[in-house]
Amino acid sequence: MPALLGIPALIRFIMGLVPIAIGYFAKFLGMIITRNGLMASALIGAILSVVSFSIQLLGDALSSSMGGISADFGNLMSSVLPDGTTTCITVIITTRIAVFVFDIKDRLLGIANKVI
């Protein structure tokens, strides 16, 4: 009979423990998602800014070096290349950069998990 008297106390204990465990798990999962998201965003932003800066420098260098070339060369290039070439190349390069960044992020997190 004394064993049956402890069942309501055990149920109340479990009912108090379950929300705490769920809250702890949700907080832990939120921290992991936030950390990974922030790391990925920072890496993507840094790499895209470096790539855009280098493309800008390359474009400036080419435009200054090709100052003596006539407009016929530009007309030739516009007639050879399709309409959406620059957009297509930009999307492909951005996708490759995003895949590279997520690969780097996974490697960094793997190293961090081995250390910790």
Curated annotation (Swiss-Prot):
Where are the membrane-spanning stretches? Answer: 13-33, 38-58, 84-104
Q: Does the keyword Transmembrane apply?
A: yes
Membrane topology classification: Multi-pass membrane protein
Subcellular localization, as worded in the UniProt entry? Virion; Host membrane
Q: Which domain of life is it from?
A: Viruses
Pfam families (alphabetical): DUF5455 (PF17537)
Q: Name one GO biological process term.
A: symbiont entry into host cell
Question: What keywords would UniProt list here?
Answer: Host membrane, Membrane, Transmembrane, Transmembrane helix, Viral penetration into host cytoplasm, Viral penetration into host cytoplasm via pilus retraction, Virion, Virus entry into host cell
Quote a single Gene Ontology cellular component term. Answer: membrane
| InterPro entries associated with the record | DUF5455
| Similarity comment: family membership | Belongs to the inovirus G6P protein family.
Task: Outline what the protein does.
Answer: Plays essential roles both in the entry of the viral genome into the bacterial host and in budding process. The formation of the G3P-G6P complex termed adsorption complex is essential for correct termination of filamentous phage assembly.
Listed under subunit, the entry gives:
Interacts with G3P; this interaction is required for proper integration of G3P and G6P into the virion.
Name used for this protein in its record = Head virion protein G6P
Q: Which organism is it from?
A: Salmonella phage IKe
Source organism lineage?
Viruses, Monodnaviria, Loebvirae, Hofneiviricota, Faserviricetes
